[in-house]
Structure formats: structure tokens, C-alpha cells
Amino acid sequence: MIGKRNASKRTRQDDCITYEEYQRKRKKTFLNTFVNICSRTVTYAKLFLTKTPISELDRIAGEAIPSNSNSTNSKLEPSTKAPESRFSHINSKTERGYVTVESDMSSHNTLDRNSKPTVSHSYTNSSKDEKFLDPIALQNLFSPASDTHSQNIHDEALSPSSFRVSRSRYFPRPHRSSKNLSVSNRLQLAVFKETTSSTLSHGNSVEADEINSFNPTPFSSSPLHFTNSSPNPNSDIVTPDKQLDVVSEHARYKHLPFTATLRKKSPHDSTSRKASFRFVQSDQQPARNIVTSDIQNEKSLLLLIRDLKEKQTESFQDWNEVDFLQLKGLEISPPPTRPKFIPELEFPDNARKRALKYLNQSNSVSSSEPIITKFNIPITLKDLHTLRNRQWLNDEVINFYMNLISERSKIDSSLPRVHGFNTFFYTSLQRRGYAGVRRWAKKARVNIADMDAVFIPVHLDVHWCMAVINKSKKRFEYWDSLAGSPGKVFDLLRDYYIAETKGAVDVSDWENFMDDNSPRQRNGHDCGVFACKTAECVSRNVPVQFSQNDMPELRIKMAASIIDAQIY
């Protein structure tokens, strides 16, 4: 059982840089497992000596509740009545037979190693409607005449809004819910303060450090503090909820670069838009976090860049902070100014309505049935839904659209002669060289030497780019909406074109072209649309003029083009 439980914690060899590091981490994992076994053995021994019923501990594991008890050396002895306290409303609602662990959270830092929490059996039925709704009662609760030791609303022993903060300081939040943990792990959470503190994850450790350094602001007992209005957005007061939000955000994105400088700070984000008191009822429930689409796009872009750096060192190994900030256009310089995309192709209203109908249609059993089949590519509703906003395009959609571009050039003689390979061409060329793709043009019944432009989608695991062999302009082009370096793309294209044309076309004076003012994406989802639309513009020999703001409309046009098998 122990081996199965710790299987996910063991270090895999491919996660380590060297074999010595793998052996070192493996020994550390075995040592931690041995220490955990010893700790559980001591835990069972303590519970056996104190005669604590094992059957009741399943209910209390990991749910220690603070109280104002001042005992630091209490024994694990069951009582028949729950202690009465004027702050008993802070505790969870209990039912008959519910067991709680009561300890002094305010003096938890002064506990010695031999101190133990008190386990008490509560057999009273507390009222489920027990709330403080009267502002006067709340004012009296924190009045100077009160016999409590503090008037601070952020005190762990007093403030319901700070209860979650004080609990997170000592009791970790495991990856699984407490009821799914093993008995030994739950016993550790209920008995050992040192053990629970040491098992904090990195994110929770950062959160605990931030909370411990938090200096609460004095609380005034004026009735004005109990209004239903939201706090002043420009206030400098740092509430516990705001503290947890900041710490959680830092812990979640600490591995990403430039997060601190890229996030746009708004004066309305200085405090949480939620009242500090849980028991104050309000007619309006404002959102706790104001997350705009810009922030979501920024996070998705950061994650995309991180994945590209991890998986594709060829194209993104030379990136630095300055390059990324220039790409984002937040701190150093704005992104290239592009004119608003003006549709040059006819887009009928009925085609738009059909596209919106399919895009808004919910997934069903019939979603696996092809909507249209052409070029030996079936397009299902699931494939078409990749053209929804914030979705990645799949191979079927991109291949179908590239075939539409090739077919249009054959029908309309006024357009340049172009051919588009599918999404697997560059992967085969990269892995096997010309030998892996030497029959592709023959199967497509095209002569590459006669084509004015050849389009090759470049797939970088989680990112789409477009490479072009532009014979009419005598250059090899690379279009990347993230402005990444081309890597070996130009060399592979040059070698392929020379081998495919058998030297009939002289490419010695051809240039490697990258447009510094090319359209750039500002999220982590639209790279496929950028690549396809770039190929469509080059196939008509028109400037590549569109921007991130045009993506919703371009997605609809691509969906309509696929449904009607005609580019709009």
C-alpha cells in the first residue's frame, strides 16, 4: 500500500539532468519514505497509549479547529461535553457524534514539542442557523469593553474571516481531500504540529511565510464597517482574502518568467471586491477576482512560451526578457502597428449564419459524423469546434484549408500558382530529410519547380508557423506570430527545393526572409489562425495585414470556408 501511495512521488530518470542526480533524488525519496513509516508508527503508538478510539479519528483528521483554550499540555482524553465559548460560532457546524480537535491557535507558536491538541467528543446538536446578522451585536463583540485580549479583526482567535488564514498556517492542504487520505496521514494531520508543518508543499510554504509576515491593520468598531458596500478600491488595506490571492498567484506562476513585470496593474485591483465578514449578508455579490480577457490571454501566452522553450530549444533558445517584452509591447515598445484588416473577399450573410450555427451547436452523438468530406479529409463537428474562440486548430482543419488555397489557385488563373503541403510534411522533412518527402509532390501531382509559392505548415509541438518557398520573389520565408527564430527551417527548405527541382532552379541568390512587422498574436490560442491566414494572403500576393483583433471574425470566415468548400 505504501509503495502504491508513494508511486507518484518517485523520481523518474528522464526528469533528471544526470544519472548522479537521479541516484541522489532516488535515495532522498527512499529516506523520506522510511521517515514517514517511522512517523506513522510513533503516531499509532501514541494513540494506543492514550487509548484514543481509532474509529472516531477518521472524522477529525485534517480538520483541527481553533478555539480560545489556553492549555498547552492537555491530554488526549474524551469529554462528554463540548466547551462553551463566546466564539463557538467560528467552529464548524457539528452533528451528534462529531469529534473536533481544539487547540490554542494564538499560542501555537509557543507550544513545545511535547504539546498535544485536545480531542473532545461533542454530542450536542448545534443550530445550523447560528449567525451574526445584527451590526450592533457585531459592534459589541469587538467593543473595548469586551473581555477579549484583542480588538483586531485579523486576530486568529476572533476573526471568522481570518480563520482560513490561521488554519492554513499550520495545517497543509493535501493534493487529495482529507477524507481520501490514509488513516496514518490523517492521524499525522491531527496530532503532530511539526509533521504537518514539514509536509507543506512549496506553494503553501510560500503562503504561510507571507501570512506570518502579515501585519494586520487595526479594526475600528464603528457601525460603518458593517455596510453592504464594497471596500474602497483605492484603499491600501490588505485583507486576508487579498493576501491569499496574491500569494496563490505568485506560487502558481513563480516558474514563469517576467510575470511580475508583464501584469498590468489596475487601481481597482488593490483590494478584493468582497466584504471581509462572512456573516454579513449582501444583496449584491461582486466578483472576488476581476480577471479580464487581457490577463487570460497573457497567461495563456506565457504558458505557450514556457512550453516552447522546454520542447523546442531550436527556435526559442536565444529568447531573453527584452525580446519577450518587445513582443508583448507592455514595457519597452509597442508591437508593430498594423492597419485594420479590411475583408477583400466576398462573405455572404447566409454563409456567416451557417458557420455560426455549427460553431454554436453543442456537441452530441452526431458530432463524430462528417459535415463535409473533401480532399479525402472528413470534417466533423468536433473538428469545426476548434475554430471557436480560445481553441487550438487541429491538423484536419489546417490541412483542409491548405487544400482550399491550392484548389483556388488552379481554378482562378489570375492568381499565382501555389501548392500547400499538409501538416506532416515538415515533420518528415526534419526527421528523415529529403528521403522522407521525395514522393509527396508526385502523389499530389504537382511540379514544385512550376509553382510560384509552396506553403509548408511548421508544427513546433504546441505552436504553428508558416514557411513559404516563394519563387516569384526569390526567397524563403518564415512567418511566426511569436517572432521566434527560424532555427533550421531555411536550411531544410533550401535543401529540399534544390533536391526536388534537381538543380533546375538557381537558388544561390535567394534570401532568407522574415518580416519584422508581421502580425503577432497576444494569446496562446490563435497561432493556427495566424498561420493559415498568412498563407491565404501570400497566395493572393497581397500584404499580410491583419491583427489580433481580427481573430474572432477570421475564425468565422475559416469555418464558413470549410463548410462551403470555398475560401471567403
Curated annotation (Swiss-Prot):
GO terms for biological process: positive regulation of mitotic recombination-dependent replication fork processing; protein desumoylation; protein processing. Residues 83-96 have a biased composition (Basic and acidic residues). Residues 66-77, 116-126 have a biased composition (Polar residues). Residues 64-127 are annotated as: Disordered. It comes from the Eukaryota. InterPro entries: Papain-like_cys_pep_sf (IPR038765), Peptidase_C48_C (IPR003653). The active site is at residues 463, 480, 527. GO terms for cellular component: cytoplasm; cytosol; nuclear envelope; nuclear periphery; nucleus. Its EC number is 3.4.22.-. One of its GO terms (molecular function) is deSUMOylase activity. A cysteine protease that proteolytically removes the C-terminus of pmt3. This is Ubiquitin-like-specific protease 1. It comes from Schizosaccharomyces pombe (strain 972 / ATCC 24843) (Fission yeast).
